[in-house]
Amino acid sequence: MLTKFWNNLTTEEIAKLSRNTIIIVPFSAIEQHGSHLPINTDKIILDKIIDKFCEENIKSKDFVVLPNLCIGSSSEHDSFQGTLSVDSVNYINFCLNYLESVFSKKFQKFIFLNSHGGQISHLDILAKELKNKYKSSKIIKANYFLFKGYNKVISENELLHGYHGGEFETSLMLYLANDLVRKNKIKKNKLSPDFNNKKIIGFEKKIKLQWSTEDINKTGIIGNPLNANSQKGKEITNIATSTIKKMIKELKLL
């Protein structure tokens, strides 16, 4: 079996997979990413990282990748043109019904690999509900943008505050899908003064203020893409694929 993608397998081939085969479930989003990145940035980045990982591990029989569920819950970007979003309740219910068709079969081990920060809490609920019903299942929840090691490439400040169309994602797109980046639109970006103030209540504080993207920046960008480059994107991609490999190695032992 040289394909790693569920969609490219036959029903007989899937039936022959080991119950210990790790099922990678990609979650992304279609939402605005400012004027310099396409609306499918989250999907492109995750697909390309997974493609690279599969190429590096083509002979492995440890995992199979489900289709990327790319219509996510992106209500924080609803006021911007191009965003496609499902409300939280319907999104969780759809994902639950969709994944039951895999969980209800023989498979036991899953990696929820997510590229959209706005649905982290949704996937927490999803994993909790599935684990409650399928007690023997092992579920990893992994947000690729939170993997360790990126601080060797991107500044701590930009990693903390630049998570939507900033240096991190723009560098990845310059490496993974260079032709889709509107380079003439890349410019210095400033955040709302309320974003990182010294008060105890805030967008990123322990006591959180709920926000929509326009509360932080009218451009739709959170972060500063000005220092992005393809070399940084390559290094980030390598860290991501290496981390996925380590996750699979550890999950195999559970």
Which role fits each region the language model picked out?
Residues M1-K109, G117-L254:
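Extended, histidine- and acidic-residue-enriched regions that form the cofactor-binding/catalytic faces
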